Amino acid sequence: MGSEEEKVVVPRNFRLLEELERGEKGIGDGTVSYGMDDADDILMQSWTGTILGPHNTAYEGKIFQLKLFCGKDYPESPPTVRFQSRINMACVNPENGVVDPSHFPMLSNWRREFTMEDLLIQLKKEMMSSQNRKLAQPLEGNEEGRTDPKGLVVKCCVM
């Protein structure tokens, strides 16, 4: 018996179930939320996130929708994060909405302990950073459409 602490590695699906439970309960001050994109997704890969634009920034009063994809190596590897809502941020590709790990340290320095909640909170903090807080934002909603990798134009309509 050594004096070193043994770390218990929680299996991927148990970890995602914990995150789902936490997301369903509501987190923090209510300015970020997340949950499963498809309840029938038995691999628990596709998630949605929401960030309410922080006060006193160019994002104030806006609701930003995101897609998070947790591959088979999550939580060892970070999820892929894509803004569905149009947004102007230094770490987001303006063409496809993907958060660029090379410009968002949390993704490039991902650790197993990080969660989707942590990720959304950090993106909200990034919105408040000096380099992003005053950036001019695209028109409301997704009226211009965002072209996906297959060349399709993605549009959103709320009825």
UniProtKB/Swiss-Prot annotation:
* Entry-linked CDD domains: UEV_UBE2V (cd23807)
**One Pfam family from the UniProt entry?**
UQ_con
Family in the record? Belongs to the ubiquitin-conjugating enzyme family.
* GO BP: positive regulation of protein polyubiquitination; postreplication repair
Q: Which InterPro entries match?
A: UBQ-conjugat_E2_core (IPR000608), UBQ-conjugating_enzyme/RWD (IPR016135)
Q: What is known about what this protein does?
A: Has no ubiquitin ligase activity on its own. The heterodimer with UBC catalyzes the synthesis of non-canonical poly-ubiquitin chains that are linked through 'Lys-63'. This type of poly-ubiquitination does not lead to protein degradation by the proteasome. Mediates transcriptional activation of target genes. May play a role in the control of progress through the cell cycle and differentiation. May play a role in the error-free DNA repair pathway and contributes to the survival of cells after DNA damage.
Induction annotation: Not induced by stresses.
Q: In which tissues is it expressed?
A: Expressed in roots, shoots, leaves, stems and flowers, but not in pollen.
Q: Which species is the source of this protein?
A: Arabidopsis thaliana (Mouse-ear cress)
The protein's matches in SUPFAM superfamilies, at most eight in alphabetical order, are given as: UBC-like
Know the name of this protein?
A: Ubiquitin-conjugating enzyme E2 variant 1B
What assembly does the database describe for this protein?
Heterodimer with UBC35 or UBC36.
Q: Which GO terms describe its cellular component?
A: mitochondrion; UBC13-MMS2 complex
Q: Where is the UBC core domain?
A: 11-159
